[in-house]
């Protein structure tokens, strides 16, 4: 009496702590896995995870690191109940240690990105193309997009003009320099 099965306990804890954009799988063998329902950033405050884990060794929560980028469908954590049954009051204490629905995924907000690349004689066009391709791959999970791609001479006046041209049409601007920045008087800083 007063005990609940491992699956029911895992499901209760997982359901109570899981918030926005987190899907809880059906518990099986005392384990309820948690999955991201969108691309974004995992919010799993370490102090809250530790507080839940400190309640009793019979109920554990493991998550990916706090503020880690995650993708839709990725497993982000698991609640595991170790014994076949646990006291109902202990499950209530575990749930109370973690604010309701505090484990969540903060979805990315799509951003418009302007890219300005400075050019010097001898810089291969393939270098700029590869830089843009790799950046495009990296921002794709965040649903961000390159809305402007401008290439200008590696000179301060040309860079300033390009920045002014695109500043109002984007949420973010990235400048790729044709040469390394060595001091404050360089073109880019």
Model regions and ranges:
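Solvent-exposed alpha-helical segments within well-ordered globular domains of core cellular machineries
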Residues: 11, 15, 115, 133, ...
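Phosphate-interaction motifs
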Residues: 1-91
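A short secondary-structure junction signal
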Residues: 89, 125-129, 186
């Amino acid at each position: 009496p007063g005990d609940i099965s491992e699956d029911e306990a895992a499901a209760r804890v997982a359901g109570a702590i899981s918030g926005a954009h987190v899907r809880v799988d059906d518990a099986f063998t005392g384990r309820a896995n948690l999955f991201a329902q969108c691309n974004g950033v995992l919010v799993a405050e370490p102090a809250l995870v530790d507080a839940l884990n400190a309640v009793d060794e019979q109920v554990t929560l493991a998550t990916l690191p706090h503020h880690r980028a995650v993708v839709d469908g990725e497993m982000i954590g698991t609640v595991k109940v170790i014994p076949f049954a646990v006291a109902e009051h202990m499950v209530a204490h575990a749930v109370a240690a973690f604010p309701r629905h505090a484990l969540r995924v903060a979805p990315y907000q799509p951003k418009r990105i302007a890219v300005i690349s400075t050019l010097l004689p001898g810089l291969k066009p393939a270098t700029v193309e590869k830089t843009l391709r790799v950046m495009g791959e990296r921002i794709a999970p965040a649903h961000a997009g390159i809305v402007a791609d401008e290439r200008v001479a590696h000179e301060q006046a040309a860079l300033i003009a390009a920045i002014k041209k695109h500043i109002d049409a984007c949420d973010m601007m990235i400048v790729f320099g044709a040469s390394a920045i060595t001091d404050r008087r360089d073109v880019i800083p």
